[in-house]
Amino acid sequence: MPACHGKRLFRLAGRRCDGVDLMKMPSPNSKLISGAAIMLALWAIFLLSALVISWALDIDSRLSLSGDGARMLKAEAVACSGAEVALHPAVTPGSRNLSGQLDNGASYEARLSGEGGRLNLNWLVAGEDPDRLEILRRFLEVKEIDLHERDTMVDSLLDWVEPNTGLHHLNAPSESDDYHPPHTLLTRIEELKKIAGWSEFTSTPGWEDEFTLNSSGPVDLAWASRDVLLALPGLTPEIVDRFLQARRGPDGIDGTEDDTQIRGIDDAHLLLRLNEEQFKRLNGLISFKDPVLRVVSVGTAGKAKRTVQMVFRRIGAVPQLITWKEF
């Protein structure tokens, strides 16, 4: 048996050689293995922590989205409530019931106005009545659109809505593969964006506010804006401003409690201060208290806001809904 530092080497397990326990002698790679194990453990802890943090952030995001969604639904519901209040036949534009707050903190603010105060485009172009078309031309002039553009816009609109008879209006572009009018009346105000010559006008914010397709037709003197009134024959800025001041009352706002009570077309005639000849020019072009109304109701819940817009016809006790829009 070979010697171990001058002593005999024992092969039995657990025996010592030169005072050293062979079973407890460290392996050359033991420190490397221990270090790797620690690194793996730390890496596992890091990954687990990252997963927990990601999960927590996801839950927080979902809760936040859920809260925002709940507030949006609440705002939409309360906006609908305001619109439904406006449908009641006893509610007038200046009614205090058009604004309110619920127990849950949500609130609504609704505004009721006459649809007839806007220009009904289909009515203006129907049959190419020169007096009606002149209202549209003057309105575009009030909006500071030059003569050449006005001619293009009006002729293109006429081509767009009239039946396809092969005739073509002088200032409208010819039909092509890229431009093909449907030759039917407008169904949505937004169609104007597709009509030649109207792109610049319809890119202006609020351009659609003074147009409609849903009124009875003639301009409603109870609700027409300054620009719409100026488009009527014989109405000068002085006449219009004087009329609006009287119609709106001290606060200068339509649809409030201090508005002048105008009972009919004869009262409107007196407020306009037109002679009989001047007023006769408006015959067939104006009305008073068109039965078609518009309500715009804004619901608020926290920072969330939703708007409901309805156009309806108020005849009798049951309103007839024409359009509904949410945004």
Protein language model features and the residues they cover:
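N-terminal leader/signal peptides at the extreme start of proteins
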Residues: 1-34
